[in-house]
Amino acid sequence: MTVLETHAAILARAFATTGLIDPLPEPVVADDAAAAGLQAAAISALGSPIAGWKIGATSAEAQAIMATTVPFYGPVFADRLWEDGAEIALPQGFRGFECEFALRLGADLPRREGGYRADQLAIAVDAVVPAIELVATRQRLAGM
């Protein structure tokens, strides 16, 4: 197993069990390509159906906090969506809540050369709904 596959399996197990892990022993995300590779491997290791995607660090302030200069994206897993009124156990590493706008698409937007214009994206949106994200870390941090 490669270092990347090992780290992906560790992250997937922590996510699946809502447990905390010690910080990963070796850096594997030296650049965007390595981070994307780790994310893809962890998603594959989880094996959970993906219900949608989220974006983060969409403002300069959020990017400064996250030590990045660009927004990033990640999957929203189907087994992590709850309807209004659901009782949810807070995971270890819980850090807080974030209020979000969730966009429900009326049709898939397949990846394509050149991407999409804003007007093409707007007509693909079926609904805008409120959402609440439970923010949690998977790594044991100082004071946790």
Regions found by a protein language model. Name each.
Residues 2-144:
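Catalytic-core "active-site belt" of small-molecule-metabolizing enzymes
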